[in-house]
From Swiss-Prot:
Keyword Ubl conjugation recorded: no
Pathway in which this enzyme or protein is active: Amino-sugar metabolism; N-acetylneuraminate degradation; D-fructose 6-phosphate from N-acetylneuraminate: step 5/5
Protein's UniProt name: Glucosamine-6-phosphate deaminase
InterPro entries: Glc/Gal-6P_isomerase, Glucosamine6P_isomerase, Glucosamine6P_isomerase_CS, NagB/RpiA_transferase-like
UniProt cross-references to CDD domains, sorted A to Z: GlcN6P_deaminase
Length: 268
């Protein structure tokens, strides 16, 4: 796991955008795994800026989102399809027919939808770079604590903590879903590269458990310890409970030298 600590959240977004841009510019048909929530919004803004500046094109890119609320219409402003359209897809040249979410409408079988989503990812050649955030309880996607480390795309019941964390996004009289479709932990680990972004003091405990805690389903993000190419981008607040800050800074300086000479990716 490569841990990189930045002074602030904006620097996290800028570095994450460099990872995405290099992949898109290096690979003819890149496949991105995308996330929602507050953390990646600044990343998407950086990518939109790069597109408008002529630094990259999404025309050959395929994307798969981590999750989507169960039974919510894609046109609903609380849907993750709406989120992605508003924050990225509407502002770049990506073909929306090649942007996928694990949508499961009312009356559809969530188990069949999960299998179908896994098939679509496989048919696209797998995910090259999966973007992640992390919940305060260590969840990635909607893989809540005690999720199986071997799990695949499926329906999940959201914990009360996740519901509380997300309640600020819903009006008091607005329906808030308690179920969601999500890529599984094994699905995430299948990505060739994983890039997790975490900012703010509220994520510090989960970050510590992910990076230095035991591998455990209690902290789903700790599964990234098993990934060959996991990159963790943190601001100082999110990294505040990690020990050995000096080591992470020193290691990053060594990696910067290698990346400058050979690029961020070793197999593209």
């Amino acid at each position: 796991m490569q841990v990189i600590i930045f002074d602030n959240a904006q620097q996290v977004a800028e570095n994450a955008a460099e990872w995405v841009a290099e992949l898109i510019n290096k690979k003819s048909n890149p496949v991105l795994g995308l996330a929602t929530g507050s953390t990646p919004i600044s990343l998407y803004q950086e990518l939109v800026n790069k597109y408008k500046a002529g630094e990259l094109s999404f025309s050959n890119t395929t994307s798969f989102n981590l999750d989507e609320y169960l039974g919510i219409n894609e046109k609903n402003q609380q849907s993750y399809r709406h989120f992605m359209n508003e924050n990225l897809f509407n502002h770049v040249d990506i073909n929306k027919l090649k942007t996928f979410l694990p949508t499961c409408n009312q009356g559809e079988n969530p188990r069949e939808q999960g299998l179908d989503y896994e098939d679509k990812i496989a048919q696209a050649g797998g995910i090259d770079l999966q973007i992640l955030g992390i919940g305060a309880n260590g969840h990635i996607g909607f893989n809540e604590p005690t999720s199986s480390l071997a799990s695949r795309t499926r329906i999940k019941t959201l914990t009360q903590q996740t519901l509380n964390d997300n309640s600020r996004l819903f009006a008091a009289d607005e329906f808030q879903p308690t179920l969601a479709m999500t890529m599984g932990i094994a699905t995430i680990l299948d990505a060739r590269y994983v890039l997790l972004m975490a900012t703010g003091k509220s994520k510090a405990k989960a970050v510590k458990e992910m990076v230095t805690g035991p591998l455990s389903a209690v902290c789903p993000a700790s599964s990234l310890q098993l990934h060959e190419n996991a990159i963790v981008l943190l601001d100082k607040e999110a990294a505040s409970e990690l020990e050995d800050h000096e080591y992470y800074v020193w290691a990053d300086k060594q990696n910067v030298k290698i990346n400058q000479e050979f690029g961020l990716y070793h197999n593209y």
